[in-house]
Protein backbone atom coordinates (compact mmCIF):
# COMPACT_ATOMS: atom_id res chain seq x y z
CA UNK A 1 0.00 0.00 0.00
CA UNK A 2 1.12 3.51 -0.80
CA UNK A 3 0.10 6.47 1.36
CA UNK A 4 -0.03 9.90 -0.23
CA UNK A 5 2.26 12.18 1.80
CA UNK A 6 -0.04 15.16 1.22
CA UNK A 7 -3.50 13.81 2.04
CA UNK A 8 -2.74 10.48 3.82
CA UNK A 9 -5.06 8.47 1.56
CA UNK A 10 -3.93 4.89 0.95
CA UNK A 11 -3.73 3.28 -2.48
CA UNK A 12 -2.70 -0.07 -3.90
CA UNK A 13 -0.34 1.48 -6.47
CA UNK A 14 2.50 3.85 -5.67
CA UNK A 15 1.95 7.42 -6.83
CA UNK A 16 -1.69 6.65 -7.64
CA UNK A 17 -3.32 9.51 -9.52
CA UNK A 18 -5.89 11.21 -7.30
CA UNK A 19 -7.04 14.60 -6.14
CA UNK A 20 -5.58 15.81 -2.86
CA UNK A 21 -8.37 18.03 -1.69
CA UNK A 22 -9.07 19.67 1.60
CA UNK A 23 -12.69 18.51 1.45
CA UNK A 24 -14.14 16.87 4.50
CA UNK A 25 -17.14 14.59 4.64
CA UNK A 26 -19.00 17.39 6.39
CA UNK A 27 -18.57 19.55 3.26
CA UNK A 28 -20.74 17.09 1.34
CA UNK A 29 -23.29 16.52 4.11
CA UNK A 30 -23.79 20.16 5.13
CA UNK A 31 -27.27 21.45 4.31
CA UNK A 32 -28.69 18.06 3.32
CA UNK A 33 -32.11 16.98 4.51
CA UNK A 34 -32.47 14.71 7.52
CA UNK A 35 -33.83 12.04 5.16
CA UNK A 36 -30.79 12.21 2.87
CA UNK A 37 -28.40 12.10 5.83
CA UNK A 38 -30.22 9.06 7.23
CA UNK A 39 -29.89 7.32 3.85
CA UNK A 40 -26.18 8.12 3.62
CA UNK A 41 -25.39 6.85 7.12
CA UNK A 42 -27.52 3.75 6.60
CA UNK A 43 -25.56 2.97 3.41
CA UNK A 44 -22.23 3.59 5.18
CA UNK A 45 -23.24 1.46 8.18
CA UNK A 46 -24.44 -1.33 5.88
CA UNK A 47 -21.03 -1.41 4.19
CA UNK A 48 -19.20 -1.34 7.52
CA UNK A 49 -21.18 -4.39 8.65
CA UNK A 50 -19.70 -6.25 5.65
CA UNK A 51 -16.09 -5.36 6.43
CA UNK A 52 -13.53 -2.66 7.12
CA UNK A 53 -14.55 0.14 4.76
CA UNK A 54 -13.06 3.63 4.75
CA UNK A 55 -14.84 6.75 3.56
CA UNK A 56 -12.79 9.12 1.38
CA UNK A 57 -14.26 12.47 0.37
CA UNK A 58 -12.80 13.60 -2.96
CA UNK A 59 -13.17 16.72 -5.07
CA UNK A 60 -16.62 15.76 -6.40
CA UNK A 61 -17.83 12.58 -4.68
CA UNK A 62 -17.59 10.35 -1.62
CA UNK A 63 -15.62 7.15 -2.17
CA UNK A 64 -15.93 3.98 -0.13
CA UNK A 65 -12.78 1.88 -0.08
CA UNK A 66 -11.66 -1.51 1.14
CA UNK A 67 -8.17 -2.02 -0.31
CA UNK A 68 -9.35 -0.18 -3.44
CA UNK A 69 -12.33 2.07 -4.02
CA UNK A 70 -15.44 -0.07 -4.27
CA UNK A 71 -18.36 2.37 -4.38
CA UNK A 72 -18.99 6.06 -4.89
CA UNK A 73 -21.77 8.33 -3.67
CA UNK A 74 -21.98 10.66 -6.64
CA UNK A 75 -25.00 12.71 -5.59
CA UNK A 76 -26.81 13.56 -2.38
CA UNK A 77 -30.26 14.67 -3.51
CA UNK A 78 -33.15 16.10 -1.53
CA UNK A 79 -34.71 12.68 -0.89
CA UNK A 80 -32.22 10.18 -2.38
CA UNK A 81 -28.57 9.32 -2.88
CA UNK A 82 -26.97 8.17 -6.14
CA UNK A 83 -24.39 5.42 -5.75
CA UNK A 84 -22.08 3.83 -8.32
CA UNK A 85 -20.48 0.40 -7.98
CA UNK A 86 -17.53 -0.08 -10.40
CA UNK A 87 -17.21 -3.69 -11.53
CA UNK A 88 -15.01 -5.36 -14.17
CA UNK A 89 -18.07 -6.89 -15.82
CA UNK A 90 -21.68 -5.93 -16.36
CA UNK A 91 -24.24 -7.59 -14.10
CA UNK A 92 -27.41 -7.14 -16.15
CA UNK A 93 -29.51 -9.74 -14.31
CA UNK A 94 -30.66 -7.59 -11.39
CA UNK A 95 -33.47 -5.35 -10.23
CA UNK A 96 -31.43 -2.79 -8.31
CA UNK A 97 -29.32 -1.00 -10.93
CA UNK A 98 -31.14 1.48 -13.13
CA UNK A 99 -28.13 1.97 -15.41
CA UNK A 100 -25.01 -0.01 -16.29
CA UNK A 101 -22.44 1.76 -18.44
CA UNK A 102 -18.95 0.83 -19.55
CA UNK A 103 -16.33 3.47 -18.92
CA UNK A 104 -14.94 4.32 -22.37
CA UNK A 105 -11.54 2.79 -23.03
CA UNK A 106 -11.62 0.51 -19.99
CA UNK A 107 -12.99 -2.77 -18.73
CA UNK A 108 -14.90 -1.02 -15.94
CA UNK A 109 -18.69 -1.11 -15.84
CA UNK A 110 -20.35 1.44 -13.57
CA UNK A 111 -23.53 0.12 -11.98
CA UNK A 112 -25.84 2.96 -10.91
CA UNK A 113 -28.11 2.54 -7.89
CA UNK A 114 -30.50 5.20 -6.60
CA UNK A 115 -31.48 4.87 -2.94
CA UNK A 116 -34.74 6.50 -1.80
CA UNK A 117 -35.44 4.48 1.37
CA UNK A 118 -33.38 2.56 3.88
CA UNK A 119 -35.21 -0.58 2.77
CA UNK A 120 -33.67 -0.16 -0.69
CA UNK A 121 -30.59 -1.82 0.81
CA UNK A 122 -32.22 -5.22 0.34
CA UNK A 123 -30.67 -8.68 -0.04
CA UNK A 124 -29.85 -8.09 -3.71
CA UNK A 125 -28.08 -4.80 -3.02
CA UNK A 126 -26.25 -6.34 -0.06
CA UNK A 127 -25.02 -9.14 -2.32
CA UNK A 128 -23.51 -6.57 -4.71
CA UNK A 129 -22.01 -4.67 -1.76
CA UNK A 130 -20.42 -7.92 -0.56
CA UNK A 131 -19.13 -8.61 -4.08
CA UNK A 132 -17.66 -5.11 -4.34
CA UNK A 133 -15.99 -5.54 -0.95
CA UNK A 134 -14.57 -8.97 -1.84
CA UNK A 135 -13.20 -7.68 -5.15
CA UNK A 136 -11.78 -4.61 -3.43
CA UNK A 137 -9.85 -6.44 -0.75
CA UNK A 138 -8.55 -9.03 -3.21
CA UNK A 139 -7.34 -6.58 -5.86
CA UNK A 140 -3.68 -6.46 -6.80
Predicted regions mapped to residue ranges:
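Charge-dense, helix-prone N-terminal extensions
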Residues: 1-140
Amino acid sequence: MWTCPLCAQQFVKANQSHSCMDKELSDFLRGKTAHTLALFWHFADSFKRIGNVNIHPTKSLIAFAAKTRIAFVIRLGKNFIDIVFPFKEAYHDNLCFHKIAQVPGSNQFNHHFKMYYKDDINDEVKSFMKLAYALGINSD
